[in-house]
Amino acid sequence: MTSSGTIDISDGTVLRLTSQDTSAALDASLFNGDGTLVNATDGVMLTGELNTNLETDSLTYLSDVTVDGDLTNTSGTVSLQNGVAGDTLTVNGNYSGGGTLLLDSELDGDDSISDLLVLNGNTSGNTTVVINPITGIGQPTSTGIKVVDFAADPTQFQNNAQFSLAGSGYVNMGAYDYTLVEDDNDWYLRSQKVTPTPQPDPEPTPDPTPDPDPTPDPIPAYQPVLNAKVGGYLNNLRAANQAFVMGRRDHAGGDGQTLHLRVVGGRYHYTAAGQLAEHEDTSTVQLSGNLFSGRWGDDGEWMLGAVGGYSDNQGDTRSNVTGTRADNQNHGYAVGLTTSWFQHGSQKQGAWLDSWLQYAWFTNDVSEQSDGADHYHSSGIVASLEAGYQWLPGRGVVIEPQAQVIYQGVQQSDFTAANRARVSQSQDDDIQMRLGLHSEWHTALHITPTLDLNYYHDPHSAEIEEDGSQISDDAAKQRGEIKVGITGNISQRVSLRGSVAWQKGCDDFAQTTGFLSMTVKW
């Protein structure tokens, strides 16, 4: 039999490849160049040896086909893809891999439907698998989605074939990445973080044998693998709510100033959800000024001011599981009002209150090379109420305990990502709390060193929802900060201040921030 085009095999037809000459003719004509064997219907049986070693632009469609003999696919492409998951290719002889296998599959949980390769003989070779996601929203898996079934008796047949996903080795749906995992001779698509193999038992065995109480809970067998873009969404959300946060000395009115320019640049990193390495570079410029001021009682003082700012933040997320990377960026503006009250004036010993409220809006971008780019917006209110007591023990020393409550209400808009997943913010707002101690020392040289010690507590983490799956960064709910700085007077009206702050918290959180500000009084 010879052919230079396409042979269509109808439903129920048997193509018998029993002659060596026939097989050779098929290899030379049907499966050479652009020749393609197409099976568009169910129930076809091929009897004999089938060799699919094609040219690079050729394809063998074997959807719902039984090969009652050997299947050799060492350099060709076998496809079950027809836009519908659930087709089966059964090989009753030996299978030799090395080429490519194309499959349709739903990508949800363990009960997802997928095309299936059933092997009933000896297997060998490395086959590259290309998954076409038909539908699904992405869900964690336990057992996984079976795509290769070694149905032969392992005591009589050898199973040496290896299967791996094309490209990065992962396929994405929604918030999760799936990879191929071998389990009991079969192959499954799983969103699974591989748990390291336990270390061998110590030699010699401890005597007596440890008996911990309570008994530790076992580590879950499977931990879902998150797509790197999830970290980008979390990075943008955290940066938007932190960009314009300030204390009473960071704006005009809080320390008797009339005009205050503040420039902030920083870098932080942490591990989100136990597997996403987050990095972020932040920069913010804020300009504030007094609008009104007046006396309060005998020697008290109050001030009302305005503030505006711009922030640009860029970061990246790298999966510790897959090695894939996503980039994120957001930039935005904020405008608002500030108020300050001093019991005995800003330069005297006594209690004080400081507050501000700003409306912020951002444009956000998250991109990943194999998963496209996402563009969306976020906006909302950030506000603060801060209280402290300025104690002047003498010799130019200032010691000031502080407490601050910060409302973080910047929320991202709902949007559809490039992978067709629906992304929203599941935690609407948050309250951040800070306890601190500020100290400074005024010298005769008009230079004032400063030292701040702060403790931050975030009751909630940044949290998003992607196609019904809620993911939290679980990062740095508690962290400490040390900030050192110096203030110098250029003239009676103008002063400069610079400082550097270091933060450290749980989940590998670390942040370094530099501050530079100029104040003008008149």
Where are these regions (language model features)?
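Extracellular beta-solenoid/beta-roll
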Residues: 1-128, 132, 137-193
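Residues that define the transmembrane beta-barrel architecture of outer-membrane proteins
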Residues: 117-119, 123, 255, 279-285, ...
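Short secondary-structure subsegments characteristic of cysteine-rich extracellular domains
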Residues: 138-155, 276-293, 422-428
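Outer-membrane beta-barrel and related beta-rich outer-membrane complex signature
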Residues: 143, 273-275, 316-320, 365-369, ...
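Short beta-strand-to-coil "C-cap" segments at the C-terminal boundary of structured domains/repeats
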Residues: 149-151, 190-196, 290-291, 519-522
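Outer membrane beta-barrel translocator domains of Type V secretion systems
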Residues: 201, 207, 211-395, 399, ...
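Outer membrane beta-barrel transmembrane domains
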Residues: 336, 420-522
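Detector for outer-membrane/organellar transmembrane beta-barrel domains
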Residues: 350, 372-465
